[in-house]
Regions:
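Short cysteine/histidine-rich metal-coordination sites, predominantly Zn2+-binding motifs
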Residues: 56-62, 72-81
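N-terminal pre-ligand scaffold of iron-sulfur
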Residues: 1-55, 66-67, 80-101
């Protein structure tokens, strides 16, 4: 199953775009030469995330996460905490969520 998220050209060169995803939200962004999709949820307390200076930061308590690995880098999140990435592919100029891959 594939679900179109956005056009590849909609994804900024820096920062992210936040999009609806089946009643929730995802960040779509560029990292390490590819497009990534991460759930817009802080694993510390479930708050939203903001993209700041190459990191995702929770405005509720200040937990921060590396955009490349998804690992917690600061704040109250457990040091072994990691963001949830979604499987995605760029096909024919579209960024698609790909279920089951």
């Amino acid at each position: 199953m594939r679900h179109r998220l956005c056009a590849e050209s909609d994804v900024p060169e820096s920062g992210s775009i936040v999009l609806p995803f089946f009643g929730r939200e995802v960040h779509v962004y560029r990292s390490g030469g590819r497009i990534r999709v991460a759930a817009n949820v802080c694993v510390h307390f479930g708050g939203p995330l903001e993209c700041k200076d190459g990191s995702f930061v929770c405005p509720w308590h200040g937990a921060s996460y590396d955009m490349d690995s998804g690992r917690a880098t600061g704040g109250p999140a457990r040091k072994d905490a990691q963001l949830m990435f979604l499987s995605s592919r760029v096909e024919n100029g579209d960024v698609n969520y790909v279920w089951g891959e």
